[in-house]
Amino acid sequence: MAANSSGQGFQNKNRVAILAELDKEKRKLLMQNQSSTNHPGASIALSRPSLNKDFRDHAEQQHIAAQQKAALQHAHAHSSGYFITQDSAFGNLILPVLPRLDPE
């Protein structure tokens, strides 16, 4: 138990050190950005939040795609119907495909 808690303490210290280093580097970049407002590199720092948002959106889409795949596999395994993955206004991950029958 003591070895486990000391390992967690080391991990926490390591995380704190990494976060402190990132914060320090962020401040340094912000200071450089403020001092050189006419520099073309300044636009790179301003576009960075959109990159983070794009990365987050991509990760979300991958997660949804994995959920859709799992739902599709489950539906195919437990049903004789046919299903497709499609975005739904109601939040459904998969939709059943219903054939149109000619009225008799």
Curated annotation (Swiss-Prot):
Record's protein name: SOSS complex subunit C
KW Repeat (keyword) present: no
Family per similarity comment: Belongs to the SOSS-C family.
Signal sequence, renumbered to the chain: none
Organism: Homo sapiens (Human)
Free-text function comment from the UniProt entry: Component of the SOSS complex, a multiprotein complex that functions downstream of the MRN complex to promote DNA repair and G2/M checkpoint. The SOSS complex associates with single-stranded DNA at DNA lesions and influences diverse endpoints in the cellular DNA damage response including cell-cycle checkpoint activation, recombinational repair and maintenance of genomic stability. Required for efficient homologous recombination-dependent repair of double-strand breaks (DSBs) and ATM-dependent signaling pathways.
Modified residues (Phosphoserine): S50
GO terms, biological process: DNA damage response; DNA repair; double-strand break repair via homologous recombination; mitotic G2/M transition checkpoint; response to ionizing radiation
Organism lineage: Eukaryota, Metazoa, Chordata, Craniata, Vertebrata
Subcellular location: Nucleus
PANTHER family referenced in this protein's UniProt entry, alphabetically: SOSS COMPLEX SUBUNIT C
Modified residues (N-acetylalanine): A2
Annotated Pfam families: SOSSC
GO CC term, one of those recorded: nucleoplasm
Keyword tags: Acetylation, DNA damage, DNA repair, Nucleus, Phosphoprotein
Subunit (UniProt): Component of the SOSS complex, composed of SOSS-B (SOSS-B1/NABP2 or SOSS-B2/NABP1), SOSS-A/INTS3 and SOSS-C/INIP. SOSS complexes containing SOSS-B1/NABP2 are more abundant than complexes containing SOSS-B2/NABP1. Interacts with INTS3; the interaction is direct.
